[in-house]
Amino acid sequence: MDRTPDHGEGEAAAAEGLTGTVVRGTALAGTGYALSQALTLAAYLVLARLVTPTEFGQFTAGMVLVALADLYTDSGMMSALVYRRDRVNEAAATAAIATVIGGFAVSLALLALAPLIGVFFGSTTIAGVAMAVSGMSLVRASGVVPDALLQRRFSFLRRTIVEPVSVLAFGITGVVLTANGLGVWGLVIAQYASMVVKTILSWGLVRWRPQLRLASYAMWRELISYGRHTIAATTVIRVGEEIPVLLLGRFTGAAPLGQFRYGRRIAALPLAMLMAAASYVLFPAFARIATEQERFHASVLRALRWMAILAIGGGLIMIPLGEPLTTLAFGPVWADAGKAAMALGVFAAARWVSSLIVETLKADGRPDVVTRMNVVEIVAGGAAMVALLPLGLVGVCIGVSIGAVVRAAYAFSRAHAVVGLPLTEMLDAIRAPVLAALAMVAILFPLETFVVQAGDQATATGLLLVALEATLGLAIYAGILHALVPGTLAEFRYLVGRMWKRSRPDGEMSDRPRMSPGLSATVRSG
C-alpha cells in the first residue's frame, strides 16, 4: 500500500516557487475559463433566438435538484483529494468507487422525485425534464476523481482544454437540436453531451487508473471526515442558490425564471477569471503553505486585494450597463434578464470576494466554518427575497445581492477570528476598490440612463456605445484606484507581464502534471 507522503510535490513546488505556480496557474486557468465563458456566451447568443424564456425556465426548473444532488455524488471527495497529503493512490481508488456508487444512487433518487418537482411547479413538462436529467449525477460522478487529481497536480489542462471543449459540445448540440424544433429537450440533450465529453477528456488527460484493490472502508471514512464539512457548506449554498428558482418558478412562472437564468449568467461574465483562480488555483496553493502562518497570511491578503480590485469593479459595472448590454446582445425579449443582471451586480462582486475567504478556510483545515457562512447568507438572502417578491424578478435579484453582502461581512469576521487575519488589513484591501467602483457607478448610471441610452439604439451602434461606456468606466475606476493606492497600476502591469511570460510555451515552468511518487508509479504500471 502506498503510504509515501507527497513530499515530492511540495518540494517541486517550493523549488520553482509557489508564487510562480499560482501566477502561471491564474493565467492559464483564467484564460481557459474565460475561453469557456466566451464559448458559452456565443452559444447563448444563438440559443436566445432559438429558445423562448419559458423553455429556458422549464429547463432551469427541471434541473433544480441536480446541482444539490451532485454534492452527495461527490461527497466532498474532490476537496478531500486535493487536500490529501499522504496515501494518495489509496484515497483516489476509494473515492473512485464511492463516487460512482453515490452517483448511481442519487440518479435513482432524482428519478423518483421528478413527479414531485412537476407538481411543485405545476407543469408536466418540467416533471418530464426532471426525469430526463436524473442520470446526469451518474455521468458527473464518473469524472470527480480525475478532476480532483488534475487540480491537485496544478495541471491546468482541465481549464484550458476540458472545459472549453465541453462547452463547445453543449453549444453545437444545443444549437443544432433547438434549430430543429426540440426546444427544452434540445437543451437537455446538449447538457448530457457536455458532461459526457468533459468526463471522457478528464480521464484521458489525467493518465491515471484506479487500483481498486487499494480501496478501503477506513480510507473512505478519512475522506468523509474532511469532506463532510464541504458537503454541509456546499449543501447550504446550493439550497440558497435554488431559492430564487423556487420562488420565481412557483409564484411568477417559467418565463421570469428563464430571464433569471440568463441574467445570472450575464452578471457573472466579467468575473470568469476570478472563479478559475479562487476555486482551482488558490485552494491547492494555500493548502501547501497553511502551516507557515506569516507566509500564509501575507499571501491571502495580497490575493484578497487583487480579488477585490477585479471583482468589485467587474461586478458593479453591470449596474449601469447590464440592461443595455443584454437587450442589444440577446434581443428585446430578454430585456428583463438585463434588469436581473443589474440587480445581481452587487451579488457577483460580494460573492467572489468572499469566495477567497472560503478557499482560505478550506486550506486552513476549517471547512466547517464555511457552513456557517453559507447559513448566514441563506437566512439573510432568503428573507430579503421573500420580502421583495412583490417586486418580481428584480426584487428577488436584489434579495440575492443582499444575502451575498451579508455573507461577505460575516466571512471577514470569521477569517479574523479563526485564521487570525488582521481585520483592519482585510478592510484596507477592499476599501479603495469599493470607493472607486461607487464613483464609477455614480458617473456611468446617469450617463447611460439620461444621455447615451445605448439600449434604444440599433444593435451595432448600441454595442459600440456600451463598449465605449465600459472603457470610460474602467478608466474612471483605474484612475481613482491609482489616486487612492499609488502603485496599483504598476503592480498590475507587472503581474500581467509575469502571467504572459509564464504562460508562453518556452516559459520557465512546464505544464506537465506533478505527481506524487505513488501516482507516478501507478501511471507507469497502469
Model-derived regions: residue spans:
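Hydrophobic alpha-helical transmembrane segments
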Residues: A127-S134, V162-W208, E222, Y226, ...
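Membrane-interface junctions at transmembrane-helix termini in multi-pass inner-membrane proteins
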Residues: A80-N89, V139-E163, W185, V206, ...
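Membrane-proximal transmembrane or re-entrant/amphipathic helices at the cytosolic face
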Residues: M1-A12, E16, H416-A417, L421-M426, ...
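Signature of the first transmembrane helix
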Residues: D2-H7, G17-S75, A98-A114, M131, ...
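Helix-loop junctions and terminal segments of transmembrane helices
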Residues: Y72-N89, Q151-R152, G263, A267-A311, ...
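Transmembrane helical elements of multi-pass membrane transporters/channels
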Residues: G25-T40, S166, L187-S194, K198, ...
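Interhelical loop/hinge segments that connect adjacent transmembrane helices in multipass membrane
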Residues: D2-L18, V22, L157, I200-E242, ...
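Alpha-helical transmembrane segments of multi-pass membrane transport and lipid-handling proteins
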Residues: D2-G10, I97-G122, G128-A132, I172-V176, ...
